């Protein structure tokens, strides 16, 4: 009898605790899965390190802009700095939305050892840091180690594209300026063409109905390219443009293009005057080569 009474008491106590927890939980606002258009911060990210052919070391950094729509400009200075050796170590100052991988590389001496390279960003009232280091389990390959379905021989034989950008004299707000890139590649990996998705597996933008049915805060469902670069138009060599540094985004037309006779041309239109660093990325399906060009935009 005593055991039965004790069991009932324990059961009643547990039930009361569960009810209390549920009641308290009902008052809690969970925001982990909320998507914010704007007002959120940028988290710098250390992605790993790689030893170069000359013995020095490259540290790779990216970021997460927690906004789904708002792009941020954080100039070099108190709110965007890398130490030691900073504040400017070649980091980005313009931040597209969401996750961006291997945005820039900082080269450090071979004897970097147990030192750390600290990237600090201040945005939306929050201070975030990323710590670059040489821990053995953070060593990566420059291409990310991903060859997809390519053969080992093809991946090993592949070399990065060559990319040369023509200088840009300047630009005027609202007027398109021409961007020329000379690009070549070894033809590897062999282009395989786009894979056609199965019925029912198409991207949301191909299945959505009338414009009036679309949520106003979901630009990715509208098929809008807010990345500044866009996806590759097809398998094979292509050149993609983004803003690396600058006070605002630029409208690239087209944002990604395939070269013709070794030339890839696009235009950029700016809405805000200032100094911009535009980045072109030549991608062959596995490896990428980056080059920058500076543009001064006036009214």
Feature annotation, model-predicted:
Residues 92, 200-265:
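Low-complexity "stalk/linker" and mucin-like segments enriched in Ser/Thr/Pro/Ala/Gly
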Residues 41-46, 137-171, 184-190, 202:
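Short, compositionally biased P/S/T/A/G/V-rich stretches that sit at domain boundaries
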Residues 11-21:
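Bacterial N-terminal signal peptides
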Residues 65-67, 183-190, 223, 227-232, ...:
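Extracellular acidic, Ser/Thr/Pro-rich low-complexity tracts
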Residues 51, 265-272:
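Residue-level recognition of secondary-structure-to-loop junctions
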Residues 55, 100, 110-115, 174-175, ...:
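Short tyrosine-centred short linear motifs in exposed loops/low-complexity segments
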Residues 289-297:
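C-terminal edge beta-strand
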């Amino acid at each position: 009898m005593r055991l039965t009474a004790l069991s009932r008491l324990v059961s009643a106590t547990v039930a009361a605790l569960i009810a209390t927890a549920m009641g308290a939980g009902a008052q809690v606002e969970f925001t982990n899965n909320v998507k914010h258009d704007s007002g959120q911060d940028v988290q710098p990210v250390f992605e790993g390190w790689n030893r170069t052919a000359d013995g020095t070391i490259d540290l790779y950094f990216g970021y997460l802009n927690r906004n789904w729509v708002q792009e941020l400009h954080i100039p070099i200075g108190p709110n965007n700095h890398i130490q030691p050796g900073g504040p400017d170590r070649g980091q980005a100052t313009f931040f597209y939305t969401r996750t961006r991988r291997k945005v820039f590389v900082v080269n450090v001496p071979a004897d970097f050892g147990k030192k750390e390279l600290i990237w600090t960003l201040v945005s939306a009232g929050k201070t975030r840091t990323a710590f670059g280091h040489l821990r053995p389990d953070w060593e990566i390959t420059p291409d990310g180690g991903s060859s997809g379905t390519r053969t080992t021989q093809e991946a090993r034989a592949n070399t990065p594209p060559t990319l040369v950008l023509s200088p840009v004299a300047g630009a005027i707000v609202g007027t398109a300026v021409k961007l020329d890139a000379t690009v070549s590649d070894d033809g590897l990996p062999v282009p395989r063409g786009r894979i056609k998705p199965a019925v029912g597996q198409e991207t949301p933008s191909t299945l959505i109905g009338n414009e009036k049915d679309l949520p106003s805060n979901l630009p990715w469902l509208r098929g809008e390219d807010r990345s500044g670069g866009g996806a590759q138009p097809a398998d094979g060599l292509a050149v993609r443009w983004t803003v690396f540094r600058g006070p605002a985004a630029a409208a690239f037309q087209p944002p990604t293009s395939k070269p013709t006779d070794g030339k890839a041309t696009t235009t950029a239109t700016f809405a805000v005057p200032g100094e911009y660093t535009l980045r072109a990325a030549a991608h062959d399906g596995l490896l990428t080569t980056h080059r920058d060009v500076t543009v001064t935009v006036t009214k």
